Regions:
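Terminal, non-globular segments
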Residues: 2-187
Length: 187
């Protein structure tokens, strides 16, 4: 077994872990809070996108079309997550973040249509994924700040989950920022 076989095998861990999370979340779905239900929906959406992207990539040779879809689904899930967590208490903040969400969604829709018209590596840009990931990190940081400044107690599990969200999406951001330069180094 060489390095290629090992890395190819490791790519199958993602749907396996997502499937496990969906099954586990489904077993406890009626007993969990709305925030954790959103996470289960998120895992299900990511599993559907993962499987669809693999099948589409095998059939058409490129699954770049799914990058903006992935970014939109992540942004939608975590916007809902933080909406229900209570960080949008003020009307100003709700309007501001709602406007950013709508503008980002419009950009992702535009990027989706431009990629679907020309899904080649040479013209690929991962801006929608970078934008959605950056906004999720900002929402998570805003969650920390608003909970620290408020006098309300926060459940330790929610605090831990928010920390994991920040760490995961910060790593994704670090990975996706240079992708444009790696793919399009001649531009």
């Amino acid at each position: 077994m060489d390095f290629y076989d090992i890395t190819n095998f490791l790519t199958y861990l993602s749907p396996i872990i997502l499937f496990g999370g969906v099954v586990l979340g489904s077993c406890y779905f009626s007993k969990i809070d709305i925030l954790y239900k959103i996470i289960v929906y998120y895992l299900f959406g990511m599993l559907a996108i993962d499987i669809s992207a693999r099948v589409y990539g095998e059939i058409y040779g490129s699954n770049l079309l799914f990058i903006p879809i992935l970014g939109f689904m992540e942004l939608l899930a975590f916007f809902c997550f933080y909406f229900y967590s209570g960080i949008l208490e003020s009307r100003k903040k709700s309007v501001f973040l709602g406007t950013i969400f709508l503008l980002s969604s419009a950009f992702m829709a535009w990027e989706f249509t431009s990629i679907s018209n020309n899904a080649t590596l040479e013209g690929f840009q991962s801006y929608s994924k970078v934008i959605s990931t950056f906004l999720i990190v900002m929402l998570a940081i805003d969650f920390f700040i608003s909970k620290i400044l408020s006098s309300k107690n926060i459940a330790p599990q929610l605090f831990f989950l928010n920390s994991v969200i920040i760490m995961y999406f910060s790593m994704v951001l670090i990975i996706f920022i240079p992708i444009d330069f790696l793919i399009n180094d001649a531009t």
